[in-house]
Amino acid sequence: MKIKVASAVLAVSILFSGWLYWGSDLKVEQVLTSNEWQSTMVTVITDNLPDDTVGPLRRVNVESNVKYLPNGDYIRVANIKLFAQGSTAESTINISEKGRWEVSDNYLLVSPSEFKDISSSQSKDFSEAQLRLITQIFKLDAEQSRRIDVVNEKTLLLTSLNHGSTVLFRN
């Protein structure tokens, strides 16, 4: 009789623990912190904007690597390649970003605290003011809250509340 009661309590405990684990943010946090994640984004600008805003910018390629640490910190390094209209040359901005992260109700909340421009080259196609504006847009995008879905162990889908999705992947 005691063995049956103990077995029943153990079974209920296992079911409850499994439900708690799979239904909580813990699984998402484990997947998020288990690897370094990469993403690639290409933006094409088709609107004719005044040259004084972003200059002759017509395409942006952003490749980034991010590591979410178990202590709630994150580190991201982004390589931003800017392509001007009518030019095959590219201008590159490298940005290192640090901050805090947390998962709440399957939303990834990111709070950047430090940005460093680690670029070494100067741009011929863009003025300093235009590069500052482009960098500021990148910084604003970093502060988004995104819904996080685990597609599989190598792929995460981050869906923004206002504009599109980002896929994080690992090799």
Swiss-Prot record:
Cytoplasmic-side segments: 1-2
Intervals, Periplasmic compartment: 25-171
UniProt membrane topology term: Single-pass membrane protein
A GO-annotated cellular component: plasma membrane
Disulfide cysteine pairs (residue numbers): none
Transmembrane segments: 3-24
InterPro entries from the UniProt entry: ToxS
A Pfam family assignment: ToxS
UniProt subcellular location: Cell membrane
Keywords assigned: Cell membrane, Membrane, Transmembrane, Transmembrane helix
Primary location class: membrane
Assembly and oligomerization: Interacts with the C-terminal periplasmic domain of ToxR, possibly by binding and stabilizing spontaneously forming ToxR dimers.
Function recorded in the entry: Interacts with ToxR and stimulates its activity.
Protein name: Transmembrane regulatory protein ToxS
Species whose genome carries this gene: Vibrio parahaemolyticus serotype O3:K6 (strain RIMD 2210633)
Chain's gene name: toxS
